[in-house]
Amino acid sequence: MKVKPSVKTICEKCKIIKRKGRVMVICENPKHKQKQG
């Protein structure tokens, strides 16, 4: 899980979602997981 000031999708399987008011990227590839904060 990477924490970044701005999250971006890396591949076409990455999805941007909102969880508990936080913007996150979820993907099949665990290296692509990101959280904004």
Swiss-Prot record:
Q: Which GO terms describe its molecular function?
A: structural constituent of ribosome
The record's GO CC annotations read:
cytoplasm; ribonucleoprotein complex; ribosome
- The domain of life for this entry's organism is Bacteria
Give one Pfam hit by family name.
Answer: Ribosomal_L36
**Keywords assigned:** Ribonucleoprotein, Ribosomal protein
For the biological process aspect of GO, one term held by this record is: translation
Which InterPro entries does this chain map to? Ribosomal_bL36, Ribosomal_bL36_sp
Coiled-coil regions listed in the entry: none
Instruction: Provide the transmembrane region boundaries.
Output: none
Which NCBIfam families does the record match to this protein?
rpmJ_bact (TIGR01022)
Give the protein family. Belongs to the bacterial ribosomal protein bL36 family.
**Record's protein name:** Large ribosomal subunit protein bL36
Its lineage reads: Bacteria, Bacillati, Bacillota, Clostridia, Eubacteriales
